[in-house]
UniProtKB/Swiss-Prot annotation:
This is Maintenance of mitochondrial morphology protein 1. Residues 194-409 form the SMP-LTD domain. The gene is MMM1. One of its GO terms (biological process) is mitochondrial outer membrane translocase complex assembly. The chain crosses the membrane at residues 101-121.
């Protein structure tokens, strides 16, 4: 066979696109339809083949694409049960999918609207009263100190009531005489003595605070210390919270002002205990800024994260500070490994107890920024939640009837504490 004959044969085997549309495609459609109907309804197709009214040409093929479409219409009329079930199931499945999709989207939109309305864009609540400490089951002899902070008194417990707690009448009278003698020799009458300004005390406190600020900011010591502390506490954080990092820290540049100091008997103590009432006022800008991320751990850990930046500032603090002295006779050490010397020092030491009145005033300035691209700024609800938690932490530790105490160092002169001034270089 020559090359010209091969080329003519290949040319005859090719088909134009118009011929495929008018001849080959209808035949393919016919075969597909017939195979589908034969597989589903064999008996009906046998009866249909005898009574068929299709207009088929002598060579068994449809005349064009119009004949194929006409055949589909006729088949749907003659056999509605075979095609109707398929159409009904498709319609039902399509409607079920659309219905579920619509309900799912609607629920997400409603949940998002509820979150925005009641959590993010809700109005900031009016200034409510300060949180109150929870009731405690341990009450002391004096009603002004019925609570003891467990976090600061972990190494101390009350002694046995029968052996050490109750003072006999002779010891009580001796204590009353000591208080009266102190007031007499210091020319102080708790009933008529005017309040003092404490200007000299403010100067001393200001020097101490200034020294603390200088040491804190030397080579960013306080910033590194806080970040290290938070890093050690990271395993205790909840799973939905990422590592917390301090981004801003300001220790302020002002000093607290103490004033209106007066000495009085502790309420409900039967004139057996003295305490000092001091008004304190701080108008400064103490700031702490942190950043973290809220993690979404479903369906797999860390699938999404929401950046959060918070800056909390205390701009005003006013309160009445109560200060009193007490010895260690009401407490006993629970440390088993302490030496006898330490035990003697614990029993003979004195403690400075302090607390704040419930009528304190603490004002905050809270800034928040949530999101990475589309950011929500200064959400009132977040500010109110943070403010409430800070006040709650403060009330549960330092607000009456709870108190804190600091052990006073021994005032007895010791050689290891002796110092002398360095000679001035000329």
């Amino acid at each position: 066979m020559t090359d010209s004959e091969n080329e003519s044969t290949e040319t005859d085997s090719l088909m134009t696109f118009d011929d495929y549309i008018s001849k080959e495609l209808p035949e393919h459609l016919q075969r597909l339809i017939m195979e589908n109907l034969k597989g589903s309804t064999t008996n009906d197709l046998k009866q249909t083949s005898n009574n068929s009214e299709f207009n088929v040409s002598k060579n068994g093929s449809f005349k064009g694409l119009d004949d194929a479409i006409q055949a589909l219409q006729m088949q749907s009329v003659l056999h509605p049960s075979s095609l109707g079930s398929l159409a009904t199931s498709s319609k039902f499945s399509g409607w079920s999918f659309a219905q579920g999709f619509f309900v799912g989207q609607l629920s997400i939109v409603l949940l998002f609207i509820f979150f925005l309305k009641f959590f993010i864009f809700s109005d900031e609540p009016s200034k409510s009263k300060n949180p109150k400490p929870a009731a405690s089951r341990h009450r002391s002899k004096f009603k002004e100190y019925p609570f003891i902070s467990r976090e600061f008194l972990t190494s101390l417990v009350r002694k046995g009531a029968k052996q050490h707690y109750e003072l006999n009448e002779e010891a009580e009278n001796e204590h009353l005489q000591e208080l009266a003698l102190i007031l007499e020799k210091t020319y102080y009458n708790v009933d008529v003595h005017p309040a003092e300004s404490l200007d000299w005390f403010n100067v001393l406190v200001a020097q101490i605070i200034q020294q603390f600020r200088s040491e804190a900011w030397h080579r960013d010591n306080i910033l590194h210390s806080l970040n290290d502390f938070i890093g050690r506490k990271s395993p205790d954080l909840p799973e939905y919270l990422d590592t917390i990092k301090i981004t801003e820290l300001d220790t302020g540049d002002d000093f607290p002002i103490f004033s209106n100091c007066r000495i009085q008997y502790s309420p409900n103590s039967g004139n057996k205990k003295l305490e000092a009432k001091i008004d304190i006022d701080l108008n400064d800008h103490l700031t702490l800024g942190v950043e973290t991320k809220l993690l979404l751990n479903y369906p797999k850990p860390g699938i999404a994260a929401l950046p959060i930046n918070l800056v909390v500032s205390i701009v005003r603090f006013q309160a009445c500070l109560t200060v009193s002295l007490t010895n260690a006779e009401e407490f006993a050490s629970t440390s088993n490994g302490s030496s006898s010397e330490n035990g003697m020092e614990g029993n003979s030491g004195y403690f400075l107890m302090f607390s704040f009145s419930p009528e304190y005033r603490m004002e905050f300035e809270i800034k928040s920024l949530i999101g990475s691209r589309s950011k929500l700024e200064n959400i009132p609800k977040i500010g109110s939640v943070i403010e409430y938690q800070i006040k709650k932490w403060f009330v549960e530790r330092c607000v009456e009837p709870r108190f804190q105490f600091v052990r006073l160092p021994s005032m007895w002169p010791r050689s290891k504490n002796t110092r002398e001034e360095k000679p001035t270089e000329l």
